[in-house]
Structure formats: C-alpha cells, structure tokens
Amino acid sequence: MKKDLLNSELHMMKKTFCMFFLAAAVPAAFAYRTSDVSLGGEWFFHMGDVAGGEAVSADTSGWERVKVPHDWAIGKAFDMNYDKQYVQVVQDGEKKARERTGRTGALPTVGAGWYRKTLELPKSESGKRVYIQFDGAMSRAKVWLNGEYVGEWPYGYASFELDLTEYFKFGQPNKLAVRLENPPTASRWYSGAGIFRDVRLVAKPQTHVENWGTYVTTPKISGKSATCRIETSVADFSDSGKKVSVRTSIISPSGKTVAQKTSGVEISGGRGKAVQEIEIKSPELWTLDLPALYTARTEVLSDGEPVDEYFTKFGVRSISYDRDGGFKLNGKRVQFKGVCMHHDLGPIGAAFNVSAARRQLEILKDMGVNAIRTSHNPPAPALLDLCDEMGILAQVEAFDEWKMVKCENGYNKLFDKWAKKDLEAMMRRDRNHPCVVMWSIGNEVPEQTVPEGRKTAKFLADIVRAEDPTRPVTAGCDRNKHAVEHGFVDELDLVGFNYKPFYYKECYDKKPRAIIYGSETASTVSSRGVYHFPTKESKNPWSHDYQVTSYDLACAPWSQVPEDEWKGQDENPFVLGEFVWTGFDYLGEPFPYDGGDYVAKSAYFGAVDLCGFPKDRFYLYRARWRPETETLHVLPHWTWPDRVGQKTPVYCYTNYPKAELFVNGKSMGVREKGGAGKFGKSRLIWEDAVYEPGEIKVVAYSADGKKAAEKTVKTAGEPARLEIKADKKKFGGEELCFVEVSIVDKDGNLCPRADNIIYFSTDGNVKLRALCNGDPTDLTPFGSNYMRAFSGKLLAVLEADGDARGSVKAASGGKGDKAIKSASVKF
C-alpha cells in the first residue's frame, strides 16, 4: 500500500434503526421506513437431524425451547472423545501427526441442529421487502421460509442477509426453519454451535439503503473542521420513476445535528450511489481516552418525501503507519499493547452477550491493553461496538485457513466459492468502526511456504483495498523466512510475525518497505494460583497434575516468555507493538495437555483465566504497559505447609524501579530492575527465599529511594467462610451478573489451595446461567449447580427474566466442610 493510502481517516459503525414501527402508531410519512426487529429470545431447537425439518407442518412438540443467541454445546457434559483429531500441526513445528484431545473444547459441537421460529408482520407492512439478517450462525447455515428454500451461508463467523420477500405472508404466521451443521475436524479451537449471535427481521421500503450501505471516512481533519465523506448505496425496487435523493444529517456525540446535506441519486438497474462531503466544525476526535462517536442519519427521499432512514455510528479520527515512525492515531504515536482473543466467552460459550464481552474488555483495559486481534475470524459486530465505545483498537481478521489444509473439513472446503463473499461481507459490515485500524486476511496459512501462495494473498488483499483503501492489509506470518523469500509479505501493508522477535531486524533489512509488528507473541502458559518447584524456564512443560506453573517461565516449543518479545521490540523501535497470545484463556487447544490420555478442556495461554480472574502474568504486562499506574504484585501465595524450610522463590511484578522483601519481618534484600539475565528488566526476584509460615511483605521504592507502596501476603488458616461479590446489583434480560466466590480463613485471607465443592441455589427470578473455576482439567459441566473451587475461587454467572428480584446463595457442602460459613447476595 502506498504511504498516502496508509494515512487513513475516520470510520464508523453502521447501526440500523432498531424500532419496529406499527403503521397505526406513527405518522404516515414514517410508516414506510425500515423496521428492524430483533429475533433474539425464544426459538424451538432440535439437536440432530430431522427429516422434513423445513416443512410448514413439522412437529416441534418434542423440541427444546431455547433463547437465541444460543450455543447448543456449552452446557453439556464434557467428553475427551468428542472431535478427536489426528493431525500434524506444522505451524507448531511437529514432524509427524498425533492424536489430539480437547482441541475443540471436549464439547458436542459436531453434528446437525435445527431451529424454528414463527415470524409475523402486520398487513400494514405489506409492500415492503423482507430480509433476515444473521450476525453469525455456526455453521453451514441453510434457511427455509414456509417450506421454501431461501438460501445458505456456510461460514459460521460471517454475517449475512437473505431475502425473504418472495415467500413472506403479511398478516399471517410465517414458519422459519434454519438447519446448521458442524462437521468433525473443522476447527482448531472451540467454535461453538448454533445461532450464536443476534438475528433480525428487517422490513424495508421498496426504495431503501442497502444492508451495510453506508461508508464514511474523514479524508481531512484539522483543529477547526473535519471533512466527512459519506458513500450511500441505495436499492430501488419500485419502478416508480420517482426522483430519489439522500439527505444525510451529522449528529454530534451530545445529540445535536451539526451538519446536513441532500444529494440526488442516479438509479440504474435498481441501484444507485450518493457520494457526499460534509464539513464538521470543531470536531470531537475519537481517541483512546475520549472515544467520541458521531452518528450519520441517512434519509432516502422519493420525490422529496422520506421513505427510509438508516443510522451509522462513526468516529472522527486519523490513522497512519510509517516504517520507522510507527502507528499514529490523530498524529500521535501509539504502540500496540494488544492481545489476541478467541470468540468464546468462557462458561457461557460462543453465544454472544454484550455484558460478558464488556466485562472482558474492562478487565483487559485494566491490564493496559489498547488493542485486540479478533483471532482468527470476524467477531460479533457488537464486540466492535464496544471497542468503539471504550476506546480500544482492533485488528479484524477474516480467516485461519485458505486453500491449503490446516483442518480436514476447515475453510479450505469453502475458499474457492466463498472467500470473496465472506471477505466483502466482513469489510462492508465493519469498515465504519473507528476502532478498526487494520484488516488481517489470514493467520499462519500454509500458503506462505509455496511461491503460488503470493497470488492468493494478492487476491484477498485486492478485495480489501477495493472495499476500504484507508486501512492497511496484514496477516499473521509464522513461516517467516518462506514468507519473505516467496514474496508473500510483499502483498501486505503491515508484516505481522507470529513468535519471531529475533527476526524483526533481519526482515527490516531485507525488505525496505516492510512495516513490522508482532501479530502473535509469547504463548506463555500458566494455571492461576498453581506453582511448581524448582522454578525453571521450560519450552515443554509437564506436570503430573496437568497444570502449568504460574511463575511465568513456561511456554510452547514454538514461542517465548514475554521478555523475549520485549527484547525484540526494545532493540528495534520500528516495531509497532504486539498482540499477545492470549488475553483470556479460551475453550479448546489445551497445550501442553492436548493428546493421549490427558484430561484438559481449555487453554492455559491467557493472562486472564476462563473465569475472568487475572493470573500473575496479568500484572507482569500491567507493570510494563501502564508505567504511570501503580502495580505491585507478589507471587507465589504463602501457604505451603509441605515446604517449611525449603527454598520458595518470591517474584514481584511492579512499575516501581526497586523493592525490598521481608519474610516475617526479616529483610531479604533490595532488588532493582535492570539486573542481569533475561528477567532482570521486568521482574524482581528473590530466588533464595525460604518458606516459613507467617507473612511476606514487599516494599516498593521510587527512583529517589522513597517508600512508595507495600504489599503483604499472609499464610492462610483453615477455610472458615465463603465471601461472595457480585459485579452489579441491577441486571436482567441480556445483562448478566458475574459473582465471584472466594474461600477465606477466619481473618479474611484467601485460602489459595482450597478446592472445596461449592453448591449454588437461587430464588425469585434469578437463575444460575453457568459456573466456572478456571481449572482447565475440571470437567464439571458449566451448567451444573455445583463445582469445586480452584485455587480458592469460583465464578457464578447469573441471569434473570426482566429486572432481577431474588438472591443467590453459595454453600460448601462437601465432607468436612460444615465449618465453612455460607454466603449470599440479594438483588
């Protein structure tokens, strides 16, 4: 991409008008506008195939009632035999194939499932065109209305629209049927299964804005004004011969209309496009700290009368990339402090929920994260809405696989027919989001290794540039030398390297146009609250408990500990930053316990566990990424009855330059950053600390030697009671409540090795949605009402129909647990 194309502009997010207009309730001039009705809520569902499941007369009396968004697998029992895969993962450096268990989460995602729902629109809507819009359906979706086949869309992560007009009957019940099927060996991680994102029924006037039909940029921005360029695509099925025009109003973040323009549309073959430039005076910029969002209100006029209305969220901001100057947002350099995120939401699975996703992003922001990579697929569009609102940058990724096989039944089966459609759909859906700053066309694709792979990269990159020339094209490259030698990276605007910090300088020298960053870094693994001795760095960790030490010294054979990546960045300031693998633990890929007789269902890679509880590594990144904010974290815990008198190293992760350790009041010396060895710059370490019951205290000092902060960790006594903490008191509907339960001693100290079984009960309209403890080896179903604590903690997810009115109680009822006092919270 030319440098001038890398100087991009404002982008924004389309949001269709989400209120259903009944003709009797609104003025006549508005009755013809688009009505957009969410189909979330109750559907009928049948697990397994059904002969004649599409028929109008299909019997659903034995079907399950579920709420969409829905993941049919997440609440079921785990089984390590589900979707076993026998595969050689070249990307991981494997020389031969081996059996993999738990790769897709050990849950029953494979197979077919049917959904049915009755749709109705009043006769007053007659004359409109009717569409159904899916934000995502996993996978191989086929849709029927009133027994008639409407269409299909196989890529489960793609959003799509199908036209129901021909078969829709106004004023009558319409029978919608959706068949989904997930083949085996189709994914490398937990995909989820079902209609796992939002669905909408949209009735549009004959003349209307097309789906994803606006494209807004800001080619010129100054302190005094911003030029807003809006392309609006209009469909006209009316054959009325009436004059069509578009009136665009710009609404400020405070809700005031600050500019307006009307332009004619030349209709040809039923379609037309308006291109408008509108000046915004004294614009409020979209920034990471103050993510101001404007709205473009688009009205389609027919002979001057409004017939359709469409809303687009966007932000006024500029982005640019430079080989040496880095990434700039509104003219100021920003280093990517990013994480990769799979799409599952832990114990609630792949069924998207805004409150759960918001919670994840809030936790990551506290760590210092300013960017996410949607690994390795288009996300739920509402996730990007959240990034827009919260000031988080996003790399949106399209594919994990092209033509060459990574999974036997993966995207390679779809590429030739669907890649262009899927990529265009992603681009048109997401190109108005100000948070999106780059497009990824692939991750670790084998095409890097063959000369002809460059052609496929060019094919996809050309589609991206045609749809949005304002943002760069990238990909995650793990076969670095092949990608450079075969010219694969020459088709990219930004060269993303996966786990290659020692190659940054070589590529920089070989490719004079290359702009480089770490698209996937670290892959350090750990289990929250688990510590193994002796402490040692390992690239192939294994332990009899199927856990990984949280001293943050273990990683995969293909990867590194965080300090290796940081060295590559610090020595090469041209590097744009990194996207760590991963922000959260996720379902599937339970390395290193991912084969044979191992029992593990979820990954160990996250800086945050599956519950949303930070691991120690969270604070290692926080200390680096938020140097102006106090971080003082001490590990391990100090409850080791079996280690009295033994060396038990103490680590401190802090933004302060030095700290002193005290064991039961005795100083173990001061450690300063900048010491020898790989970890000297980032960790303060007392290798010779000896365990004795009591307490450890770390006192941090500022650069001038003054005491700045202190942190004490005490030896815990016997479990005495449960502590319960809800993240909110008001919830219900789609808003979930996340309840943290901790086992503490009589003085309130966390019992870090407690694994008591905790039972939950609710009353009123409060219901238990899921339980999770963050232990990758625990196969208790998420939908149970009991679960063991892991490292002294447990998460309960609550839901309610309507505003929550009731309570939740947590009690330990296992053998010998009678002395542990229960806890509850009322809503």
Q: Where in this protein do the model-derived segments appear?
A:
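Extended acidic/polar, glycine-enriched regions
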Residues: 168-171, 231-322, 686-688, 692-693, ...
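Short, hydrophobic beta-strand segments
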Residues: 164-166, 276-286, 684-691, 782-802
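Beta-strand-rich structural segments
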Residues: 230-234, 299, 650-653, 699-700, ...
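Accessory beta-strand-rich segments of carbohydrate-active enzymes
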Residues: 39, 47-48, 105-215, 237-238, ...
